[in-house]
């Protein structure tokens, strides 16, 4: 964290506190010169080994039937009941406290313009891996296929409970101000 400049923003969606983290340094620089890559090299990078840049791994051992039973059914019943009694316990028993949603509708992609939600996916995946690499925060990209600010806000409100943070990215003005 000390090598990057981060800005924290707090949101209160129906008494649910969420935070958003934005990093300011996102380019590869050498002595103030940005490195350039060919389109072919960039496409090969994004398609090498597995497509995309994100994968999900278990933080617990999954080597026995017992591990699987604890991770899913019937083992999840105990934390489910605890979270039901006290929703704040979700931070203790789930990834919520270290999980950020990186959200876009693709209406203002990195100087490329309005190319749509699915076209923004490589950028959102890229931001998610920056969170992991530089802050050890797990992040997942969510592309919302809508240009309606109210619909976007409602979508975010509905799934915000799953995340400790929300990062809004590449949403065109003036909608970005309405949504934030």
Regions found by a protein language model. Give the residues of each.
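Acidic, proline/serine/threonine- and glycine-rich low-complexity intrinsically disordered segments
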Residues: 14-23, 28
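N-terminal ligand-binding/catalytic initiation module
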Residues: 30-180
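General helical secondary-structure elements
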Residues: 11-12, 123
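Intrinsically disordered, low-complexity regions of eukaryotic proteins
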Residues: 4-5, 14
């Amino acid at each position: 964290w000390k090598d990057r400049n981060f800005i924290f923003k707090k949101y209160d969606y129906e008494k649910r506190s969420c935070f958003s983290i934005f990093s300011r340094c996102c380019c590869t620089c050498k002595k103030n010169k940005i490195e350039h890559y060919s389109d072919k090299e960039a496409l090969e990078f994004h398609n090498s080994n597995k497509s995309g840049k994100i994968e999900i791994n278990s933080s617990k051992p999954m080597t026995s039937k017992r591990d699987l039973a604890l991770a899913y059914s019937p083992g999840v019943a105990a934390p489910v009941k605890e979270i039901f009694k006290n929703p704040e316990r979700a931070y203790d028993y789930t990834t919520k406290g270290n999980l950020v949603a990186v959200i876009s509708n693709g209406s203002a992609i990195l100087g490329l313009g309005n190319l749509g939600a699915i076209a923004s996916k490589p950028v959102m995946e890229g931001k998610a891996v920056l969170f992991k690499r530089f802050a050890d925060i797990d992040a997942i990209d969510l592309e919302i296929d809508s240009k309606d600010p109210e619909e976007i806000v409602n979508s975010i409100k509905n799934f915000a409970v799953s995340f400790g943070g929300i990062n809004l990215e590449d949403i065109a003005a003036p909608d970005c101000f309405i949504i934030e």
